[in-house]
Amino acid sequence: MARVFLFVLDSFGIGGAPDAEAFGDLGADTLGHIAEFCASGAGDRAGLREGPLQLPNMSALGLVHAAKLATGRLPAGMPLPERVYGVYGAASEVSRGKDTPSGHWEIAGTPVRFDWGYFPAEGDAFPPQLVEAICREGEVPGILGNCHASGTDIIARHGEEHMRSGKPICYTSSDSVFQIAAHERTFGLERLLELCQVVRRLVDDYNIGRVIARPFVGDNPGNFTRTGHRRDFSVLPPEPTILDRLEAAGRTVHAIGKIGDIFAHRGVTRLTKANGNMELFDASLTVVEEAEEGDLVFTNFVDFDMLYGHRRDVPGYAAALEAFDARLPDLDRRLRPGDMVILTADHGCDPTWRGTDHTRERVPVLMFGPSLRSRSFGIANSFAHIGETAARHLGIAPGPHGRSLL
């Protein structure tokens, strides 16, 4: 029996989505544009990084080849490696959104074929009757924000008034989300989480995918900082995922980071919380040592998306990729015969793109392990094939929406 380690580099798209134009994202390419900026010097930042994008380990696993499959061109400053050591390719999403739950659920074998509900971008984002119900049932004196916004911007804009008034900061984006920011000291973390549970129930009628708690600390706009106590309150996946199938087969599903929240904790048998990419990697390595035969270890590396993609920070994103890449040998040294690692992403978030939202892109799929021989599988027409590849490797029955890429 084998083990599978499924690592999602949140938002690390590689461009080329065949339906990108329908999402307003024609030409978006997270990897390609980061590489282009770095090759031109626009990705330099004093004390952080400089020069072309350096991802030698992922390149050796087929990343550059996958990018060329997705877009027809090589990322600037990233030559083809002399040898590839993994099974590689690109995957297109069939789910109707470009959001986190849709991407992860499809990776786990369950595409999202329905349309999420969204809040309007102009005027008040939330209907008056919803706001009234939130204030009444959540026992708050009102809300601030009530608009589409960047999380860091809206905290800077309304944070002080929130601390004075006790009104939570409520906002949304182009994703199907209702986000609530509140100060951990003056409002209270537990109170924020309780409010999110109230709102989760109230927005079910609007078909909203997630309610997200965004706690922060600080005493003025200059030092307001979001903490690592974020929580996502998601709806359940529409069908059983590979997590459910593994749980039913008596296997252990290790959910690291926000994976548990994304799947509403369904099919998760062991939860490990960690904050920040390096802490998430360390936690994953610990579980690699502990996981038993037949286990799935599923980690989301959120910083790429949360800290750099949405904030349109090219040098930060590039440095985070390079730091992640440098840790891969630590993982490789811990693998046992029969183990398989899958590196992929759930959507794009091109830091050079207009706005602050996700971008519709293909994603890389890089697989390696002691028993895998190098080859390309080409372009998969659904993320669901990723989950089915893991299912076959772990020896459980196939699901209805994909096939193994091996």
Curated annotation (Swiss-Prot):
It is an enzyme of class 5 (isomerase). PANTHER family: PHOSPHOPENTOMUTASE (PTHR21110:SF0). It comes from Sinorhizobium fredii (strain NBRC 101917 / NGR234). Keywords: Cytoplasm, Isomerase, Manganese, Metal-binding. GO terms for cellular component: cytosol. Mn(2+) 2 binds at residues 305, 310, 358. This is Phosphopentomutase. It catalyses: 2-deoxy-alpha-D-ribose 1-phosphate = 2-deoxy-D-ribose 5-phosphate; alpha-D-ribose 1-phosphate = D-ribose 5-phosphate. Its main location: cytoplasm. It is found in: Cytoplasm. GO terms for biological process: 2-deoxyribose 1-phosphate catabolic process; 5-phosphoribose 1-diphosphate biosynthetic process; metabolic compound salvage; nucleotide metabolic process. Its cofactor is Mn(2+). The keyword Isomerase applies. Mn(2+) 1 binds at residues 10, 346-347. Pathway: Carbohydrate degradation; 2-deoxy-D-ribose 1-phosphate degradation; D-glyceraldehyde 3-phosphate and acetaldehyde from 2-deoxy-alpha-D-ribose 1-phosphate: step 1/2. Binds 2 manganese ions. Its EC number is 5.4.2.7. Isomerase that catalyzes the conversion of deoxy-ribose 1-phosphate (dRib-1-P) and ribose 1-phosphate (Rib-1-P) to deoxy-ribose 5-phosphate (dRib-5-P) and ribose 5-phosphate (Rib-5-P), respectively. SUPFAM superfamilies: Alkaline phosphatase-like (SSF53649), DeoB insert domain-like (SSF143856). Belongs to the phosphopentomutase family. One of its GO terms (molecular function) is phosphopentomutase activity.
